[in-house]
């Protein structure tokens, strides 16, 4: 399932984050890539111990926790601290699938990359190219969202970032270890949850809502791996 989360960050928050990102020191993005990915990766990344990255990452995590859409779509158990990349001057990242398991820096905690997320910090008209191309069962999708928007998609998806030929593309990326590993099952739970929320508004107090809610939680109980 691919899902856009609009306005995860406010314009003021985006502006403050951009200022911090523009002033921060960057490193070659291949430093964090495996041998195969490094062959197709040409971008810059903030070091994992970057103070600016940690501060912005904490803001993103706070916003995700307050986003009912993100929580419903991803059913997070653990979220890897957000990372940050920068594309310019032809920078690109060719077709690849992300590692299945990541370790939270400074810990022994493992995070399975069930769901990938990208948060955009540059407006689409600030750069040419730079589309996130995701290929999966839902087809071939080209993603280039407004600053402050986020996109979530399965961690199993083949994806790439097209070359940025003008301007600079700033973004954050990270992975969520979901309570439900299967994308198909997460989609069923998400659709059911969204319908329950809509029916709650249209028909508050309807006894059928309790039954539907019970079905949702029984499915979650059956499928979750907490």
Swiss-Prot record:
UniProt EC number: 1.14.11.-
GO biological process, any: DNA damage response
Domain Fe2OG dioxygenase: 78-178
Positions bound to 2-oxoglutarate: 169
InterPro entries for this protein: Oxoglu/Fe-dep_dioxygenase_dom, PKHD_C, PKHD_hydroxylase, Pro_4_hyd_alph, Pro_4_hyd_alph_FE2OG_OXY
Molecular-function GO terms, alphabetical: 2-oxoglutarate-dependent dioxygenase activity; iron ion binding; L-ascorbic acid binding
Keyword annotations of the record: Dioxygenase, Iron, Metal-binding, Oxidoreductase, Vitamin C
Broad class of enzyme this protein falls into: oxidoreductase
The record's free-text note on cofactor binding: Binds 1 Fe(2+) ion per subunit.
Cofactors: Fe(2+); L-ascorbate
Pfam families: 2OG-FeII_Oxy_3, PKHD_C
PROSITE patterns associated with the record: FE2OG_OXY
SMART domains linked: P4Hc
Residues making up the signal peptide according to the UniProt record: none
Residues the record lists as binding Fe cation: 96, 98, 159
Domain of life: Bacteria
PANTHER family the UniProt entry points to: PKHD-TYPE HYDROXYLASE YBIX
NCBIfam families: PRK05467.1-3 (NF003974), PRK05467.1-4 (NF003975)
Record-given protein name: PKHD-type hydroxylase Daci_1172
Organism: Delftia acidovorans (strain DSM 14801 / SPH-1)
């Amino acid at each position: 399932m691919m899902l856009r989360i609009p306005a995860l960050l406010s314009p003021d928050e985006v502006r403050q984050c951009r200022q911090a990102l523009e002033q921060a020191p960057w490193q070659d993005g291949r430093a964090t890539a495996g041998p195969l990915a490094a062959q197709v990766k040409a971008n810059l990344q903030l070091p994992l111990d970057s103070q600016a990255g940690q501060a912005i990452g904490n803001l993103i995590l706070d916003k995700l926790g307050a986003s009912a859409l993100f929580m419903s779509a991803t059913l997070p158990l653990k979220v890897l601290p957000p990372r940050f990349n920068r594309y310019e001057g032809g920078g690109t990242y060719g077709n690849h699938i992300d590692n299945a398991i990541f370790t939270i820096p400074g810990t022994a905690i493992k995070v399975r990359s069930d769901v990938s997320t990208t948060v955009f910090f540059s407006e689409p008209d600030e750069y040419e190219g730079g589309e996130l191309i995701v290929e999966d069962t839902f087809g071939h999708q080209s993603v280039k969202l407004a600053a402050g928007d986020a996109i979530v998609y399965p961690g199993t998806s083949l994806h790439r970032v097209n070359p940025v030929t003008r301007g600079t593309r700033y973004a954050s990326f990270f992975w969520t270890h979901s309570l439900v590993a299967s994308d198909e099952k997460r989609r069923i739970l998400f659709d059911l949850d969204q319908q329950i929320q809509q029916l709650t508004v249209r028909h508050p107090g309807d006894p059928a809502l309790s039954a539907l809610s019970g079905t949702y939680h029984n499915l979650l109980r059956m499928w979750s791996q907490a």
